[in-house]
Amino acid sequence: HRPAMNPIVVIPARMAASDLSGRTLLLTGVTGFLGTAILEKLLRDVPGCTVLALIRPGRLGAERRLRQEVMASDAFGPLRDRLGAELDAAVGTRVVPLAGDLGRDGLGLSGTDLARLAGVDVIIHSAAEVAFDSALDVALRTNLEGPVRLLQTVRSTGAMPAVVQVSTAYVSG
């Protein structure tokens, strides 16, 4: 069952770190290269923001994947050197791992996590199928239906966030 393709177009104004301070951001693709870099940048340069990190739980669970796959990344080396144990405290208070999947209705979120989406001010969508030899149906499901499902789910909570869409290599002709 494919999600309805209602046109949802959001063009946010350019945002500076000060604009994002105190805001709640929903970040997808956080276990990927770019998503990890975005999370590090948010923690380093945007004080006071809260990041809801949508993570496919896999066999480890979302929280464990955040700690073992994302926070252990070399991308966090300089920030870890600067903050030491304070980084773990910052992650514990500012990053909320949400066990979810863009391929599932309601993103597969628990009722508690779905309710958290009502407070989202900004979505940064960096999850994508980026393999150049992916089957077309896999690429469409991830890169087209996933973002539509994401926006529909967030908007179903009453939130009307700004959206930053990170595109794949295939968007330009």
Show which residues each predicted segment covers.
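N-terminal Rossmann/SDR dinucleotide-binding element
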Residues: 2-122, 126, 136, 157-160
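Conserved Rossmann-fold NAD(P)-dependent oxidoreductase catalytic core, especially the SDR/UDP-sugar
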Residues: 118, 122-127, 133-141, 145-173
